């Protein structure tokens, strides 16, 4: 896992860590898309309340999504709040969203990665 460096440490509302799958997804993106995703995550982590950038997923228990639109492409990173560390959000993995709803397989994958995270703590 790796952490994202946030702009103003004293204003951080929560910290974000990336599981390996999320890191690999980001690493494989074009640099400008990756930069925009990090920028949007930092804005939300520093206190911006914007459901266009970070919102609870519909119909999924306790999963959230970081949302970025860049160059006409919808990028998503699914995440959850760590139950012990109340100010920690864990990004499980990312994908390019092609449909209105989040595909069920992505929800299942995020839930499996969340389980793996807690088992390794």
Q: What are the residue ranges of the model-derived segments?
A:
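Basic, Lys/Arg-enriched alpha-helical interface segments
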Residues: 1-74, 83-88, 96-121
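Conserved catalytic cores of phosphodiester-cleaving nucleases, focusing on short active-site segments
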Residues: 92
């Amino acid at each position: 896992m790796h952490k994202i460096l946030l702009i103003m440490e004293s204003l951080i509302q929560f910290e974000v860590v990336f599981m390996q799958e999320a890191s690999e997804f980001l690493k494989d993106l074009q640099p400008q898309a990756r930069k925009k995703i990090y920028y949007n995550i930092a804005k939300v982590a520093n206190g911006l309340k914007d459901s266009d950038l970070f919102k609870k997923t519909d119909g999924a228990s306790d999963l959230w999504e970081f949302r970025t639109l860049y160059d006409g492409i919808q990028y998503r990173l699914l995440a959850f709040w760590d139950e012990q560390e109340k100010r920690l959000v864990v990004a499980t993995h990312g994908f390019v969203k092609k449909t209105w709803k989040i595909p069920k397989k992505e929800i299942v994958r995020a839930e499996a990665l969340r389980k793996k995270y807690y088992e390794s703590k």
